[in-house]
Curated annotation (Swiss-Prot):
<dbReference type="GO" id="GO:0046872">
    <property type="term" value="F:metal ion binding"/>
</dbReference>
<keyword id="KW-0460">Magnesium</keyword>
<protein>
    <recommendedName>
        <fullName>DNA primase small subunit PriS</fullName>
        <ecNumber>2.7.7.-</ecNumber>
    </recommendedName>
</protein>
<dbReference type="GO" id="GO:1990077">
    <property type="term" value="C:primosome complex"/>
</dbReference>
<dbReference type="InterPro" id="IPR023639">
    <property type="entry name" value="DNA_primase_ssu_PriS"/>
</dbReference>
<keyword id="KW-0808">Transferase</keyword>
<dbReference type="InterPro" id="IPR002755">
    <property type="entry name" value="DNA_primase_S"/>
</dbReference>
<dbReference type="GO" id="GO:0006269">
    <property type="term" value="P:DNA replication, synthesis of primer"/>
</dbReference>
<feature type="active site">
    <location>
        <position position="99"/>
    </location>
</feature>
<keyword id="KW-0240">DNA-directed RNA polymerase</keyword>
<keyword id="KW-0804">Transcription</keyword>
<dbReference type="InterPro" id="IPR014052">
    <property type="entry name" value="DNA_primase_ssu_euk/arc"/>
</dbReference>
<comment type="similarity">
    <text>Belongs to the eukaryotic-type primase small subunit family.</text>
</comment>
<dbReference type="GO" id="GO:0000428">
    <property type="term" value="C:DNA-directed RNA polymerase complex"/>
</dbReference>
<dbReference type="Pfam" id="PF01896">
    <property type="entry name" value="DNA_primase_S"/>
</dbReference>
<keyword id="KW-0639">Primosome</keyword>
<keyword id="KW-0548">Nucleotidyltransferase</keyword>
Amino acid sequence: MMPMFEPATPLERKRYYREEWNVRDLPDFIADNLHMREFGFDHNGRGPSDRYRVFRDERSLARFMRVRYPFAAYSSVAFYREPWKRKGWQRSELIFDVDAKDLPVRSCECDGVCPTCLDEARELVLMMVDTLKGDLGLGDIHVIYSGRGYHVRVLDPEVMELGSEVRAEILRYTAGAREPRRKFTDGVSSYEMEHFSIPLGYHRVFTERARHVLLHLRGDEDIEDVTARTVKTAVRNRNLILEDRWGEFRSVIGPRVYPRLVKGISKINMRMLDAKVTIDLKRILRLPTSLHSKVSMICMEVKNPETFDPLKSAVPRFVDERE
């Protein structure tokens, strides 16, 4: 295991929160409504059993963190009138969770996380942010490096009061998790068009996500209703995808097999994100600025996802001082 991905000791946690962490580094979208959020803490690495915590101001939170130096710190995506009871729900952020260690398709073979799968998770996040902005017209979007992946947090007013069902539909669109429509009619005759022939809307979204999956297949993955032979054929010929020669790729796979591959990829796309996080209106998420003690990485807001490198920006000082 690489040094920065080793668990933090209690002494290292104490050093981080007393010497490096600063409550003023909290993102504004959390600091501005601190008193409306529920906080939760994991003190021993067994999960956030210390729940229903509320902090009226940054000073009280800072005092708690420095005294307790928790294994993990979380805050709710929901805003409450009475957060100490988790009652009086008002609204919730729209969340997308991409965890590098849980990606069903990734080109590395590590047991947890490594620079390769973290970068592939970042690629997914960039595509998602582009879709949220370009297709859905959303703008109040924050990307958070969680320590083992990324959280995309959306605070546009029009999505904050949505229920779980609508959030699930947004997830399916953004993830490319629906099989794209192939059959169309002009009122007189019907015809078929593949997703790569329609460079707009959901078909464009799906094509981008399918490209990501196909370019990162190792060749040993199980894709529903697709043979291992077809998966290997896709891997051998993915240079066609790189060159945007989708029609030739479809011919190599086989016109009758290709729709099954598309359907299988749509199911994989759904598993590239944790759907439970998106639909849970009362979820607690790792607190930006806090330490992910399992991997000794800092959970932090990412100002520029295009150039962000967690191995340069999210490593606490104590990691460099390990023997």
